[in-house]
């Protein structure tokens, strides 16, 4: 796992959201989101921004730069 995938899961759980909840809010299917969280695929820049906004963190924090 990478810092990104660990933090993505950590924030999702902290906010009490399911993988499907986040997928719906970002407008992707659950399998796509699950692949991001498992590190099998990487979200587009547009979806990274959506995730950061939704989870109320910076992209720098999501990637361990902060």
Task: Go through the PLM ranges and name each one.
Residues 1-14:
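A short, Lys/Arg-rich alpha-helix, primarily the initiator
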Residues 13, 24, 53:
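Alpha-helical residues within the helix-turn-helix
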Residues 27, 46-61:
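DNA major-groove recognition helix of helix-turn-helix/homeodomain DNA-binding modules
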């Amino acid at each position: 796992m990478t810092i990104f995938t660990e933090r993505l899961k950590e924030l999702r759980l902290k906010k009490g959201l399911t993988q499907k909840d986040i997928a719906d809010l970002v407008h992707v299917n659950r399998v796509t989101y699950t692949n991001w969280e498992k590190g099998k695929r990487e979200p587009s820049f547009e979806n990274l921004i959506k995730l950061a906004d939704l989870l109320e963190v910076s992209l720098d924090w999501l990637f361990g730069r902060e």
